Curated annotation (Swiss-Prot):
Pfam families for the chain: DeoRC, HTH_DeoR
The protein's role, per its UniProt record: Transcriptional activator of the fuc operon.
InterPro entries: Carb_Metab_HTH_regulators (IPR050313), DeoR-like_C (IPR014036), DeoR_HTH (IPR001034), NagB/RpiA_transferase-like (IPR037171), Tscrpt_reg_HTH_DeoR_CS (IPR018356), WH-like_DNA-bd_sf (IPR036388), WH_DNA-bd_sf (IPR036390)
GO BP term, example: regulation of DNA-templated transcription
Listed name of the protein: L-fucose operon activator
Domain HTH deoR-type per the UniProt entry, residue ranges: 1-56
DNA-binding region: 18-37
Domain of life: Bacteria
UniProt keywords, alphabetically: Activator, Carbohydrate metabolism, DNA-binding, Fucose metabolism, Transcription, Transcription regulation
GO molecular-function term, one example from the UniProt record: cis-regulatory region sequence-specific DNA binding
Amino acid sequence: MNYRDELILQWVNQQGKASVIELAQHCDISVETIRRDLNKLANKGLLHRTHGGAVSNKTKDLGSFFQTRKHINATAKRHIAQKALDLLYENAVIGLDASSTSWYFAYLMPDIPCTVVTNSMFNINALVNKSNVKTIVTGGVYSAKYEAFYGPLSEYLLQRLHINFSVFSCSGIDKNGNIWESNELNASLKRKMMEASERAYLLIDSSKFEKTSLIQLADLSKINTIFSDRSLPDNLQKYCEQHDIMTVL
């Protein structure tokens, strides 16, 4: 490994994540050179490449394996997903993240003409026998832990799509209306999906109320509607009213 590679890795590991522009300035080289260096280091497994930068592979990940999450609060998640099915209409383009609640949405979806964009292998499998549902897979780097695809290839596709609405979950919402995720790769992809969508719907069970995690995903004001199994705490309900966010129980 040459000196510049060591310098890049040291900076990314110290900061947890870094943008291409930030690294170019730190190393005093061009953005194009940094991109090539990051791709090389990512191919060696020394860091994780994201759109516009990189994330340290030493960064703590608070997320759980999909098969574990799938069985936590399963009744509540199924109830929430069933309610959210009212969003569906023919020929809609729908974004689904790799959360277990989104999997219930995919599993329960009727076989109507529509398009689903997802990075989740479990969503793909849930939709495979629904002949009227066209599935677009983001591609990217596969995570065995999350059984989903992430990284710049996934995010690049999302930037080129127009999605009517996205359905996703998170690790928690704090009392100030911040949405939290367990790791940067999940957070980064969900941000891109939200940006590509006309409307964003958050499916979250009540165990995640007033909880934080590792990475701040977005502000709750970016959400159009929250689907949950119980009423929101008073402070969050007040926040939703102030920002015209609907809640569906």
